[in-house]
Amino acid sequence: MSGRQKEELQDITLLGNQNNKYLYEYDKTILESFDNKHQGRDYFVKFNCPEFTSLCPITGQPDFAAIYISYIPNIKMVESKSLKLYLFSFRNHGDFHEDCMNIIMNDLIELMDPHYIEVWGKFTPRGGISIDPYTNYGRPGTKYEEMASYRLMNHDLYPETITNR
């Protein structure tokens, strides 16, 4: 199999661009995708995003999290630099932790239409409590829908020991 051809990459504008504009307000239009060259195979793609930041919608105080995004691609895949800039756009976005994770998942579903996706946020404690929202999706009417249900019910059977994120 040969590498990517130039025409396959024409919609990728952020990767390799030294003049990217960092947005400080939520903007899903920054997300870019490319074709999955291995559509006949199920496989996971996982992004570990340890520096996510958003704002509490009530107090305006910053919230910090590590976010884990895993998906089984279908036809499209998310380009990682656009994902980085997209996540950065939450910096001044005021929303609850649970909302942020669901917004991220919904935007990625809209962009890629994956077979399966899960987004797990592990937020640092505020007021002595850490919040770890987990959300997932499997394509309805397929084995991925069943997989999503199973993973949701079993996602935290062995919770980690929280010392001090």
UniProtKB/Swiss-Prot annotation:
Entry GO terms, CC: cytoplasm
Highest taxon of the lineage: Bacteria
Organism: Macrococcus caseolyticus (strain JCSC5402)
Classification lineage: Bacteria, Bacillati, Bacillota, Bacilli, Bacillales
EC id: 1.7.1.13
Name assigned to this protein: NADPH-dependent 7-cyano-7-deazaguanine reductase
HAMAP family referenced in this protein's UniProt entry, alphabetically: QueF_type1
Reactions catalysed: 7-aminomethyl-7-carbaguanine + 2 NADP(+) = 7-cyano-7-deazaguanine + 2 NADPH + 3 H(+)
GO molecular function: preQ1 synthase activity
PANTHER family, alphabetized: NADPH-DEPENDENT 7-CYANO-7-DEAZAGUANINE REDUCTASE
